[in-house]
Amino acid sequence: MNMHEKIKARAKELRSYTAENLPKMVKTKSYSSQEEDVARLIVTLLEEAGFDEVYIDGLGSVIGRVGNGPKKLAFDAHIDTVEVGNPDLWNFDPFSGEIKDGIVYGRGASD
């Protein structure tokens, strides 16, 4: 099995875990420069997922490591969100993490 297939297989294994935990992240407000709470949540989730090493660096980024082989795979993503704006324009609470028809709704759920 090549690396791409291994990654896809592992992602499939973690699909339910991801679906359970994405709403937790959506429920945690993480406006720009206020990401500490969601960073701590991500650390907990990565530890629960079995990462060998997880920490928050000096810039507030979550760093996680699995294994220690010669090959490296890096993921880079932002964990902040922008303000909600007018809450009356939302069809649901933007921090509810509501799941409807298999889709998680809320601020930051899709990017």
What name fits each language-model region?
Residues 2-107:
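Acidic/His- and Gly-rich active-site-bordering loop/insert found
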Residues 110:
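Loop-rich non-cytosolic ectodomains and luminal regions
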